[in-house]
């Protein structure tokens, strides 16, 4: 009988962990990044790597910033090559996965659920 839930392999989890740590490091240093990201504190909430290890979906949450989500996405997109090169130096693989950034709606959804529960 097949499993209904798909679990990540050990390699996916390990690569996601390495990418998460590398992203935190490069965002903390601020080198090689779009200048708009210098005063924009971001939290990397999770990294999900596809089964073929070719795509890393990185979810972020900004805090206390004047930038819109679209501006942050644009700045991250402009910095993608530098970030990918930094990650390539951290992993021991033939190729580096394509990094894709996504705004993490989980916090917003949790607030909406909490408000709905208060109204019951």
UniProtKB/Swiss-Prot annotation:
Q: Tell me the compartments it is located in.
A: Cytoplasm
GO MF annotation: an example:
ribosomal small subunit binding
Q: Does the keyword Membrane apply?
A: no
Q: Which UniProt keywords apply?
A: Cytoplasm, Ribosome biogenesis
Q: Which biological process, per GO, is one annotated for this protein?
A: maturation of SSU-rRNA
GO CC entries: cytosol
Give the record's subunit note.
Monomer. Binds 30S ribosomal subunits, but not 50S ribosomal subunits or 70S ribosomes.
Q: What does this protein do?
A: One of several proteins that assist in the late maturation steps of the functional core of the 30S ribosomal subunit. Associates with free 30S ribosomal subunits (but not with 30S subunits that are part of 70S ribosomes or polysomes). Required for efficient processing of 16S rRNA. May interact with the 5'-terminal helix region of 16S rRNA.
* Entry's family note: Belongs to the RbfA family.
Q: What is this protein called?
A: Ribosome-binding factor A
Q: Which organism is it from?
A: Rickettsia felis (strain ATCC VR-1525 / URRWXCal2)
- GN (gene name): rbfA
